[in-house]
């Protein structure tokens, strides 16, 4: 029998050996038994409670501990250029850590907040030029940049918390563009086969079609990237597909607003920046959820098979995102309240 190091533990959920000694299993992300607990604030308790309910419905066991205070502790601190470069120095043979060298610390992303600020300021500057100088040349830039305000920072968030550091930025960009477009092609093709109307059932069908489009595109990349089998990899790949879907869709809706007969500058700003902000917890989050579900099923079966998409956690997470998507499209509560609830659930 092999001798384990003193810090080695077996994950209580996936039963894989945690050779890193980290608080959370590098294989499935579950909390290790006997790990020290950090204090969390009231907001963390609320979000953890919601997460526990969803975790139970989707087949998870045990409590879900979210250390929100630690997770965002680096956001408002000053960081050096070297720290920025280190974030993106990953994914190659020389920069991907070995399993035993994967960070033991709880992820503390921060650059995603800088991306959010950069995109928001850029959108406001483009809008300022549009209104002040009546310059319509900036409209395409405003449409595209504002459509990225919500989805792209969350994609960078997933990139930063990908503790295996085995996916480089260029791969993420490729998945964002081609994965997003592939999911749209699949979605539009399915809409030709299953046309929808304004009925409640049609709203559910439309949500299901879009979620299927994203999970198929995500799974295509997962089976292509055969050595990317960590749970965080599924979050990142699915999030990249969802971000691409969201940006292209949001740009389209903003363009529709621009073509409206009663168009005003204020309405255009509301549609462009408002729609972009809601991307924080829309397709990018739903894509990440289903991507994680596919990876969880794949961990159990090892070999990729398209039939696995419709089993276990993958199917349960697909149903969950379809329900969230349907709720998103169905005006039941005041708009801001409803979107706020969905943002909390998705995050």
Model-derived regions: residue spans:
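N-terminal acidic, proline/glycine-rich, low-complexity intrinsically disordered segments
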Residues: 1-4, 25
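Cys/His-rich microdomains that often coordinate metals
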Residues: 4, 18, 32
């Amino acid at each position: 029998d092999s001798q384990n190091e003193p810090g080695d533990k077996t994950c209580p959920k996936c039963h894989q050996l945690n050779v890193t000694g980290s608080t959370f299993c590098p294989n499935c992300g579950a909390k290790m038994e006997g790990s020290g607990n950090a204090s969390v604030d009231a907001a963390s308790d609320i979000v953890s409670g919601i997460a526990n309910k969803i975790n139970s419905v989707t087949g998870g066991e045990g409590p879900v501990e979210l250390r929100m205070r630690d997770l965002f502790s680096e956001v408002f601190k000053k960081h050096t250029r070297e720290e920025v470069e280190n974030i993106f120095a990953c994914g190659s043979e020389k920069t991907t850590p070995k399993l035993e060298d994967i960070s033991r610390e709880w992820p503390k992303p921060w650059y995603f907040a800088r991306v959010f600020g950069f995109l928001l300021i850029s959108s406001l500057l483009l809008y300022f030029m549009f209104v002040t100088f009546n310059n319509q040349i900036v409209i395409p830039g405003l449409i595209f940049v504002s459509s990225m305000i919500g989805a792209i920072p969350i994609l960078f968030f997933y990139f930063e918390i990908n503790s295996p550091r085995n996916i480089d930025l260029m791969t993420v960009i490729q998945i964002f563009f081609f994965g997003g477009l592939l999911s749209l092609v699949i979605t539009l093709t399915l809409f030709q086969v299953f046309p929808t109307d304004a009925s409640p059932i049609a709203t559910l069908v439309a949500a299901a079609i879009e979620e299927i489009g994203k999970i198929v595109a995500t799974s295509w990349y997962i089976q292509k990237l055969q050595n990317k089998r960590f749970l965080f990899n599924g979050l990142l790949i699915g999030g990249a597909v969802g971000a691409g879907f969201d940006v292209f869709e949001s740009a389209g809706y903003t363009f529709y607003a621009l073509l409206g007969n009663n168009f005003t500058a204020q309405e255009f700003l509301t549609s462009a920046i408002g729609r972009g902000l809601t991307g924080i917890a829309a397709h990018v989050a739903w894509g990440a959820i289903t991507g994680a579900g596919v990876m969880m099923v794949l961990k159990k079966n090892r070999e990729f098979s398209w039939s696995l998409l419709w089993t276990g956690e993958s199917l349960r997470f697909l149903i969950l995102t379809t329900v969230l998507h349907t709720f998103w499209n169905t005006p039941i509560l005041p708009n801001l309240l409803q979107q706020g609830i969905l943002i909390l659930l998705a995050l």
